[in-house]
A protein has these predicted regions:
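N-terminal amphipathic, basic-rich helices that act as targeting or association modules
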Residues: 1-81, 241, 245-247, 252-256, ...
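Long, well-ordered, tryptophan-enriched scaffold segments
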Residues: 4, 175-319
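Cofactor-binding active-site loop characterized by glycine-rich and histidine/acidic residues
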Residues: 42-163, 332-333, 337-338, 346-347
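Non-catalytic terminal/interface segments that mediate subunit docking, oligomerization
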Residues: 66, 271, 279-390, 396-406, ...
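Structural signature of the thiamine diphosphate
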Residues: 219-287, 407-412, 431-481, 549, ...
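Glycine-/acidic-rich phosphate or pyrophosphate-binding loops and their flanking alpha/beta elements
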Residues: 261-264, 296-297, 314-329, 345-351, ...
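Peripheral docking tails and interdomain loops at the edges
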Residues: 301, 306-312, 419-421, 440-441, ...
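Generic long, charged, amphipathic alpha-helical segments
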Residues: 359, 515-516, 521-544
Length: 624
């Protein structure tokens, strides 16, 4: 690469000739498409901010000026321009670059990221600290129009506008226009008001007028009011200015010259600025431009066709299909998503039942409380949400769901390890935090068939809030003798075994394989699978009380998790044997393939066998 090979830091971006910048953008897009096609990741959003990222690093001095990317999934170009091009081919691979911003990876990454609508709050905090430290550097938040549907973003805008801090919020508008403007005059003024010369002239004029004895201040105030009235004739909305921001734009987000001029102008304003830019999501790759949602987060794909390498079914798709089947017979079923209809498998439901489908935007808290209203009205709401995003609505689950004794279903997708999306997306906390909420029932099916049984039980044989958690990806093979009744628990193997493996969810497949291998070596081992992990069946606990050893394996956080509760219940009932819990300790889990993470935490077949064999031949059959 002629230009990327030379860029070791943002300083090298500043040294390029202006005519070279479009060629740099072209190289970056080639690298983005090629790398994501091999590693998977977020493509459309990154293709849309190439020119913006170049302009940011050309105008500002990162990391002294702090660029904060909302969600962080669109920071690939940022990584390329901050010295990480040589390692970029490792992105989302174990031991390689993160798919999101990561401060441990680079000083140019200000925060760990992955969740939406946080950037303005973070940038306001940085800007406030700058003010307290008399630091003249700038805090910049880059947020998309999608993330602006999150309530946290509006809380931050409300506070930032009143703060008077030196803060720049860049609104990357690639789907909708926040404020519809009128005609060519508006477009001309948008460009004019973004030029540095405009702000220099404005500042000098205000300074001269304010020096006029007696009447200077009044003249300045009247001119400001007149300018505002004229602007309001041209612009329909002054929402951001009403909040206290200086509004600039909209600007062509793919014109580097205009972007640089606008950013230079924004730097000169000693007040919060909102720079509104228009971009094309997926720009430069036809398949992504035509179907940006499908290329938002994508697995490995064929560059020439745009088709994913793997296109089979998965838990999300099976959930979506089955929910459509139920909804066709039961008019009470409603589906709710927080801007994740594709990811959660609800796209088919959206098309078939548009009157009972609700995309609330990035507003998980609202989704739960909205569901409570639907439930109060006699409907059966099913809110599909990734485990990691369920964290955002804990209070609503408590106050507006469980406390109200309302019947609603939470479809907890991506439960457990999610792999390459990494530290901010691992679904390792939900079982533990749901475990502490009174009145909630939690199921954890291990196969597609069990998933369907779980939803039937949740919808027609349960009360209150019911959560059904299932992993990312495909089901794992289970023994043919697997009990399909989906009672609160099931046993694989002999009831009189000296050693029991206890687990739930997808780990059941690994547990059965481990048990079979240990039995072939002469060990007396069975598996107890918890289908309902909250409340745990007392009969399930009684089933293992006479064992010598119980090994609990859990794909989640150890503290407060299901294994801890199971251990406590056994102790209360007088268990005299040895208990071992293998789970995730008090730590966040890095990005790597799911198989690698299961191996690292001793949660796959080999890990289970090794853990059990570390105990001196306990559970081995007596030899004749």
């Amino acid at each position: 690469m002629k230009y990327l090979d030379k860029i070791k830091s943002p300083a090298d971006v500043k040294n390029l000739n202006e005519d070279d910048l479009p060629l740099l953008a072209q190289e970056i897009r080639e690298v983005l498409v090629d790398t994501v096609s091999q590693n998977g990741g977020h493509l459309a959003s990154n293709l849309g901010v190439v020119e913006l990222t170049i302009a940011l690093h050309r105008v500002f001095d990162s990391p002294k000026d702090k660029i904060i990317w909302d969600v962080g999934h669109q920071a690939y170009t940022h990584k390329l321009l901050t010295g990480r091009y040589p390692e970029f081919e490792t992105i989302r691979r174990e031991g390689g670059l993160s798919g999101f911003t990561n401060p441990s990876e680079s000083e140019h990454d200000i925060f760990y990221s992955g969740h939406s609508s946080t950037s303005i709050s973070e940038a306001l905090g940085v800007a406030t600290a700058n003010g307290l430290n008399n630091d003249k550097h700038t805090a910049i938040a880059v947020i998309g129009d999608g993330a602006l549907t999150g309530g946290l973003a509006y809380e931050a805008l409300n506070n930032a506008g009143r703060s008077k801090q030196r803060l720049i919020v860049i609104l990357n508008d690639n789907e909708m226009s926040i404020s519809k403007n009128v005609g060519s005059v508006a477009r001309y003024l948008a460009v004019l008001r973004s030029k540095p010369g405009y702000f220099r002239l404005k500042a000098r004029t205000e300074k001269i007028i304010n020096r006029i004895p007696l009447i200077g201040k009044k003249i300045s105030e009247q001119l400001f009011k007149s300018k505002t009235r004229l602007k309001n004739l041209i612009y329909k909305s002054t929402f951001f200015e009403d909040l206290g921001f200086r509004y600039m734009g909209p600007i062509d987000g793919h014109n580097i010259t205009q972007l640089c001029e606008a950013l230079e102008g924004a730097k000169m304003v000693n007040a919060p600025v909102l720079l509104h830019i228009n971009t094309v999501k997926g720009k430069g790759y036809d398949f992504a431009e035509k179907s940006p949602s499908e290329f938002h987060g994508i697995s490995k794909f064929n560059i020439n066709t745009g088709e994913p390498v793997y296109s089979g079914t998965n838990f999300s798709a099976e959930f979506g299909d089955f929910l459509c089947d139920i909804a066709s017979k039961d008019k009470r079923i409603c589906a709710i998503t927080a801007a994740m209809s594709l990811g959660t498998g609800l796209e088919k439901f959206r098309k078939q039942f548009p009157d009972r489908f609700y995309d609330v935007g990035i507003a998980e808290e609202h989704a739960v409380t909205f569901s409570s209203g639907l439930a109060r009205g006699g409907m059966v709401p099913v809110f599909a949400v990734y485990s990691t995003f369920l964290q955002r609505c804990y209070d609503q689950l408590v106050h507006d769901g469980a406390m109200q004794h309302l019947h609603m279903i939470i479809a907890v997708d991506r439960a457990g390890f999610v792999g390459e999306d990494g530290i901010s997306h691992q679904g390792i906390l939900d079982a533990a935090f749901l475990n502490g909420i009174p009145g909630i029932t939690v199921y954890s099916p291990s196969t597609y068939t069990e998933l369907k049984h779980a939803f039937i039980r949740a919808i027609y044989h349960s009360n209150g809030v019911v959560a059904i958690r299932y992993p990312r990806g495909t089901e794992k093979p289970v023994p043919e003798s697997n009990d399909l009744s989906f009672e609160p628990f099931a046993v694989y193997g002999r009831d009189d075994s000296d050693t029991f493996i206890v687990t739930y969810g997808r780990l059941y497949s690994y547990a059965c394989s481990a048990a079979d291998e240990l039995i072939s070596r002469g060990y007396n081992v069975s598996v107890l699978k918890l289908n309902r992990i909250k409340p745990i069946s007392e009969d399930a606990v009684k089933r293992v009380l006479s064992c010598k050893k119980v090994f609990f394996f859990e794909e989640g956080i150890k503290a407060g998790g299901i294994g801890s509760v199971f251990s406590e219940m056994m102790s209360e009932k007088g268990f005299k044997g040895n208990f071992n819990l293998t789970a995730v300790d008090n730590e966040f889990v890095k990005h790597a393939a799911v198989s690698a993470l299961l191996s690292e935490y001793s949660l796959d077949e080999n890990g289970m066998i090794k853990t059990i064999l570390e105990y001196d031949d306990g559970g081995k059959k007596d030899e004749a």
